[in-house]
Amino acid sequence: MARNKIALIGSGMIGGTLAHLAGLKELGDIVLFDIADGIPQGKGLDIAQSSPVEGFDANLTGASDYSAIEGADVCIVTAGVARKPGMSRDDLLGINLKVMEQVGAGIKKYAPNAFVICITNPLDAMVWALQKFSGLPANKVVGMAGVLDSSRFRLFLAKEFNVSVEDVTAFVLGGHGDSMVPLARYSTVAGIPLTDLVTMGWLTAERLEEIIQRTRDGGAEIVGLLKTGSAYYAPAASAIAMAESYLKDKKRVLPCAAHLDGQYGVKDMYVGVPTVIGAGGIERIIEIDLNKAEKEAFDKSVASVAGLCEACITIAPSLK
């Protein structure tokens, strides 16, 4: 039986972590790609040399030519510039848009049947541009955002309540930025909604709002601490969960930046919503009822993403 092929486009901190995790999970053969010749080859060799110790069999190679990704089943895109302290995700737009154009052309030529997961920031605008540049079906191109944001929310809640992270589910909608919308009403501890836990006295509404704000600032908090880079362990783990659901047809319900075509009243944009990921890619977008305050917050987030997409069109009119 032919093994799956996973192409990791970008061999920085997230790319290297992705390669290691994909190897440990034996998801298939792995290609680390980067235009900086030597880095993907070196990281690929280093990770491959860990396989006898870790006990996984995976052909792991590094490459600096797009032809190496030919026939990939999954492409995970991390190429681009990472945030530095004081930068917003949006500050990266002009630089990383040019990168997405090159990546899109490479995927279009060599891996047109792949399921593509974009991690590059500003996420919602970059995945939108990548889909346009690559010409791949919208259900096969998705952004990694909600899995990470929800994971951060879950961790902070688990620490607050002193319970296992496994018993906390969390729901984050909207753009992957300061306007993201963590939904307390749809987030639970052992099935009990957070709003009920406030009523039960487990925490105050004010404390819950502090946790929600920390979730919004989750990436910036790490950037501020690292000073020379941004998060990579949790983003990589989040993308691997998405890739695994696709490769194994698990049909997991995962919040992702997905292409909306009328859902939630949004047209031709990528925004974070709950999805079902299976062998068909994004097989379903789940529309939930939002109350007035939630809808206003979601619409504000959508407007922020729309502004980024307009900025992309100004730089690259072909995206229109």
From Swiss-Prot:
EC number: 1.1.1.37
The keyword Ion transport appears for this protein: no
Native species: Rhizobium rhizogenes (strain K84 / ATCC BAA-868)
General function of this protein: Catalyzes the reversible oxidation of malate to oxaloacetate.
Originating gene: mdh
Binding site residues for NAD(+): 10-15, 34, 96, 119-121
GO MF annotations in UniProt: L-lactate dehydrogenase activity; L-malate dehydrogenase (NAD+) activity
Official protein name in the record: Malate dehydrogenase
Residues annotated as the enzyme's active site: 176
